[in-house]
Amino acid sequence: MEYAPLGLIGLLTPQANTTVEPEAWALLPTGYSLINARLVSQASSLNQRLLDYVDQLESSLLQFANAPLSVLSLACTGSSYLMGCDQESQWIEAWQKRLGIPVVTAGVAVARALQTLGVRRLDLLSPYDQA
């Protein structure tokens, strides 16, 4: 593919997220490109929206139509927190088999990066409340 000779990333972001796309473009190595689609939900509660993003993935994927994706990336850590590691791993494995391409979530990507860097302890500061 002319504009993505090394790979085309399908990036799924939450419906109102304004940061993932510019950050992804800034970090993207030469030879790769990405296309973005939105994860959407009509749920009023945040937790239900985050779960809807995962449960309704198939309809979100329709936005990519027949784009020749090399990898699918779900850029939503909140969904990972609610699924938990075991369910997330099963979900990823099922979608990889179905799509025939690697699938990665933001949560798994962060965990892999920390492991690769040898991080054993991490302090976390968050603007979110306990809910």
Kindly label every feature range from the protein language model.
Residues 1-59, 131:
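N-terminal glycine-rich anion-binding loop in soluble enzyme alpha/beta folds
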Residues 43, 47-54, 78-85, 100, ...:
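Short gly/ser-rich anion-binding loops that grip negatively charged ligand groups
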Residues 51-54, 90-91, 121-122:
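Short, hinge-like loop/turn segments at secondary-structure boundaries
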Residues 95-131:
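Conserved beta-alpha
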